[in-house]
Amino acid sequence: YLFQQLKKVTQVGGCDYSQTQIALAKKILNANDLQCMEADQIAEKPVYDVVLSDSVFQYFQSPEYGMRVVEKMWNKAKKMVVITEIHDEEMKEEHLNHRRQCVENYDEKYKGLDKTFYTKEMFLQFADRARAKCEFVKPQNDLYWNNKYVFDCYLTK
């Protein structure tokens, strides 16, 4: 999906914690700004019109870490920050119960691999401090069971 969207993009950069993923992206993309690093280490330069995080905030070690990444993304963006598939704290118990119903011994199998959940208030507070417009969107993919438990966040300058 993202590679299809890149046909419309003139300049692209990014980071991933996996050197393998970065090496693959460098082969496919015509981009110099691809780095293997933790998300909270991204540099503020170069800047981009839109800075996107696609379905990774759930893997960050804490909401505080995630909000540090939002700050970095905001400083790197000229126009907008888009964060997709943010796990909703209000839906946490329902989400975990659903996973327990679908996966036998879920808690045992996924011990130590917790998802990180966020409140919408965290993003609203950030938007207030940054003087940003903050919009939440519910993903619309009927084939993806996780949609019920996540939201997307658009922060606009």
Where are the predicted features?
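Class I (Rossmann-like) S-adenosyl-L-methionine-dependent methyltransferase catalytic domain
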Residues: 1-46, 81-157
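A structural alpha-helix within SAM-dependent methyltransferase catalytic domains
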Residues: 4-7, 70-74
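Functional-site microenvironments in short loops/helix caps that host divalent-cation chemistry
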Residues: 49
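A conserved beta-strand element that flanks and buttresses the S-adenosyl-L-methionine
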Residues: 52
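A short, conserved alpha-helix within the catalytic core of class I
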Residues: 60-72
